[in-house]
């Protein structure tokens, strides 16, 4: 067998498990709907007052529960049936999507209503996140977990291509309400996939003992590992200040490049790059710090370059490495958090990654929106890239 064929087979190694294929199929279709809603909601919020700050406030409302509950949710997932927790959380998220569609159809949608629903979504997502991702580790052999986690990221980011692209096509003729309704329907697929999983072929992790202090135990585990500690610190900085471009991209597209409806196209380009970042990471049976540092650099440089892109076409092209670096970094951080972690700690590690990735958004989102409205729309994305590059030297000793 050629080396190229070997690399390709190893890239998709964990898909030999039927349970994982079923689960990924449901996640893919459901997440397409999620990105339909995300794209439509961003455009809806910007259309109300033409302010990036409003999107920043919505980001705060949606992700503050992750900051508060995320680490605790990891301990909760380690102590309970992950499949069951994921089922109920996905059901609640589907109900939220139905409510959002109804209030939009009936003309009762407003910024306070959007913020309230986003807050509710945030609570369910904070609990769902470590259980949903931790469930992946129960569907494959232990040696296949890094590959499965990278493919999970590929599935989630691959849906980002179709979601925003569909939104760009459908939002004109259908409007935002129908996109919210389509998202509600999409939850049926992931709920169905959870019901179809063959429980007799699962490899459930040993539940962590009840009691103790799961959040403190998870943080202590990270702090005792110098490489993991530095990776988490850098990841938190990048997530806080360089991953919130969706807050300002609608205004950046409108003000700098004169493309009022260009946001879905930019987001689609980011998503295309994201697939390559996730698949590139899936090649590794073990994540290396050299690869991790490379992705950090790509992400930082891309943010700075996009900020001063001379036209919309160049901006779209630069969104490709932005997606590659960002999603590759997330997939790598997921892999690093799992490859040396005992089974009873895995959900806690995933929860800490989620807190760093999404829980930092309530801080970075409003800051990014404020910079875009008060200092300069270009600086709202460039500052994150600059801060990212300043922290790269922290990773050098682990290369």
Go through each PLM region and give its residues.
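Substrate-agnostic recognition of the 12-TM MFS/MFS-like secondary transporter fold
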Residues: 21-38, 61-75, 81-96, 113-172, ...
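Extracellular/periplasmic helix-loop-helix junction of adjacent transmembrane segments
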Residues: 36, 40-64
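C-terminal transmembrane bundle of multi-pass solute transporters/carriers
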Residues: 68-72, 79, 85, 89-92, ...
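Hydrophobic alpha-helical transmembrane segments
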Residues: 111-118, 122, 147-204, 245, ...
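Helix-breaking motifs and short loop linkers at transmembrane-helix boundaries and internal kinks
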Residues: 49, 81, 103-104, 108, ...
